[in-house]
């Protein structure tokens, strides 16, 4: 019986369509999971009366890779509107960036506040 199984297995590997017990004729396909884009989060800077504008520009350049011109525009939006979006990221990245900004601001003894908000 053992020898027959080996022959049958070899036969099945060479020509799987000729084996009677095989379920190859069955039209079953594994369902593919529907993938969705991860939810995005805005990283928001809030204005205060004590943090220098140059420090805000430095933070935007350092943590958000903005060039000087764009960092200055975002800083002015924070200053005039009270808040501005620094970037749009997945949740983990947004939380990390906000934490880094808040930690750097505290180490530099500035009350700058950065938070995340769900987009949309």
Swiss-Prot record:
Gene3D superfamilies: 3.30.1390.10. This is ATP-dependent Clp protease adapter protein ClpS. Binds to the N-terminal domain of the chaperone ClpA. Belongs to the ClpS family. PANTHER family: ATP-DEPENDENT CLP PROTEASE ADAPTER PROTEIN CLPS, ATP-DEPENDENT CLP PROTEASE ADAPTER PROTEIN CLPS1, CHLOROPLASTIC. One of its GO terms (biological process) is protein catabolic process. Involved in the modulation of the specificity of the ClpAP-mediated ATP-dependent protein degradation. InterPro entries: ClpS (IPR022935), ClpS_core (IPR003769), Ribosomal_bL12_C/ClpS-like (IPR014719).
